[in-house]
Design a protein with these regions (language model features):
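Conserved ABC ATPase "signature" region
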Residues: 99-117
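Conserved ABC ATPase signature
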Residues: 122-126
Length: 229
């Protein structure tokens, strides 16, 4: 249960949400993404963020992409192409829409570093890191204003984690990226705003605390190198 959640997220940049397991972090992501409805209060996504009405779930879903923890468990297609084009319109008069989606797909594959992966590649043969990239590309094709990610680094080796962190740093430049993660040390350097969720589901802004920790870490790292003055 989420209680007294009060936060405004920037249109661009990466917002990190931390907290103990079971606090409701993943529930918050599903609310933002339009997969569930709040029982009270308001939740606005988009231009009407100054109004007092909740953005309808269908509209939130249209404006928001979400990548679940271990997204590979939710893949439905056999090949990369089937995954990327799942749900595209198939009617005879949908040519213009499909062409636009194809352009977006090309851009998305480049954005996540999969432009060299053949579209007929079977998804099951991809590495864990490339499966995460594919999950991101699927959402980017939809061109969401908000991109939510639940534990994006979970279960990956250190090199893949570093590559995905760098990718998120790029993606946040054009949209709001909301990340739920226990991997604070790795996400912290690219975080613009941070919240801690309590066991009661309330959010506390810890952006200044995070910035202070980052500054101290930078100072300690600098002290580790000899001075050449």
């Amino acid at each position: 249960m989420l209680v007294n959640v009060d936060a405004t997220l920037p249109k661009r940049g990466l917002t990190l949400i931390v907290g103990r397991s079971g606090a409701g972090k993943s529930t918050l992501l599903t609310l933002i993404a339009g997969l569930s409805e709040p029982t009270s209060g308001t939740l606005e996504v988009g231009e009407e963020a100054e109004t007092t009405r909740t953005t309808p779930a269908a509209e939130r879903a249209r404006r928001t992409g979400i990548v679940f923890q271990f997204p590979e468990r939710h893949f439905l297609g056999r090949t990369v192409m089937q995954e990327l084009t799942f749900g595209w319109p198939t009617s005879a008069n949908a040519f213009a829409s499909r062409r636009e989606l194809a352009y977006r797909m090309n851009d998305a594959l480049h954005a996540v570093g999969m432009e060299r992966v053949a579209l007929d590649t079977e998804v099951r043969t991809l590495s864990g890191g490339y499966k995460r990239r594919l999950a991101l590309a699927i959402q980017l094709v939809r061109n969401p204003r908000v991109l939510c990610l639940d534990e994006p680094l979970a279960g990956l080796d250190w090199q893949t984690r570093a590559e995905l962190t760098a990718l998120l740093d790029e993606l946040k430049r054009d949209r709001a990226v909301v990340v739920v993660s226990h991997d604070v040390e790795e996400i912290q350097p690219i975080t613009d705003r941070a919240f801690r969720m309590t066991t009661h589901g309330a959010l506390a802004d810890v952006s200044d605390e995070l910035a202070g920790a980052r500054a101290r870490a930078y100072g300690e790292a600098s002290d580790a190198f000899p001075s050449f003055d």
